[in-house]
């Protein structure tokens, strides 16, 4: 298996500033998306360095009407005691972590075919089904966010390096996943199953379709450290690669 780390994970947007301490990713098309507007530290900062980076990012985001700051810390490193103590002084800071998993497609378990589940690559014929499904899921974060995501989904549809899949259960849109295609990896992104159709094997069928179409690549994905699906990934023979701490603060 190829050596994989968090740098292989796709982040929409572009770098607007880079120095020896961090790089700053900005996504003007999705200002409301926390995970594509952030600072990622190359090394663990001191408290003073963090405060300076926080001040810079807050000022930058305010110019664009953004009401959050998001930080990622170096792969596989624990937060220092000084940083943790500093974060605990502000109850609006949320510390979390992501876990990175990878699998060779041949190691993915066999999935039983069920005729009521159909998985397809999104085409012009199924585009509206995909878009309506995504809009319903995105609306949880507000109508404004969902509208912005519609434009992003269209950009992704036109991007040859991104493949969108949709699953139908008895003819109804029931799940979806995007695949970020790179030279050596295929990244599973946004794997979702509608709450009305969970525990029917739809998520596994979506993943199996990815494995079948990209059997020459390492398939990777990121799971929130607090989410339960990561246990499912382990059962499906994904290999745990490592974790990365992050910090979020949302301003009112």
PLM region spans:
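Conserved acetyl-CoA-binding loop-helix of GNAT-fold acetyltransferases
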Residues: 50-57, 190-195, 199-213, 231, ...
């Amino acid at each position: 298996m190829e050596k994989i780390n968090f740098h292989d994970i796709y982040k929409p947007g572009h770098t607007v500033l880079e120095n020896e301490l961090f790089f700053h990713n900005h996504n003007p098309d999705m200002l409301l998306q926390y995970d594509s507007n952030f600072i990622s530290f190359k090394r663990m900062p001191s408290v003073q360095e963090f405060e300076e980076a926080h001040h810079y990012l807050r000022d930058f985001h305010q110019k664009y009407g953004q009401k959050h700051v998001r930080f990622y810390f170096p792969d596989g490193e624990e937060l220092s005691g000084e940083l943790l103590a500093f974060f605990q002084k502000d109850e609006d800071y949320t510390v979390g972590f992501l876990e990175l998993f990878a699998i060779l497609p041949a190691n993915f378990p066999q999935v039983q075919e069920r005729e009521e589940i159909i998985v397809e690559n999104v085409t012009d014929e199924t585009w509206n089904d995909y878009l309506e499904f995504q809009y319903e899921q995105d609306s949880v974060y507000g109508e404004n966010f969902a509208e912005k995501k519609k434009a992003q989904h269209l950009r992704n549809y036109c991007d040859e390096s991104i493949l969108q899949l949709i699953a139908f259960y008895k003819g109804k849109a029931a799940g979806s996943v995007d695949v970020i295609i790179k030279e050596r990896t295929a990244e599973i992104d946004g794997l979702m199953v509608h709450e009305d159709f969970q525990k029917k094997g739809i998520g596994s069928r979506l993943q199996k379709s990815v494995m079948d179409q990209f059997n020459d690549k390492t398939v990777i994905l990121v799971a929130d450290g607090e989410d339960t699906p990561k246990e499912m990934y382990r059962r499906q023979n994904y290999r745990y690669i490592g974790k990365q701490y992050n910090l979020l603060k949302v301003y009112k």
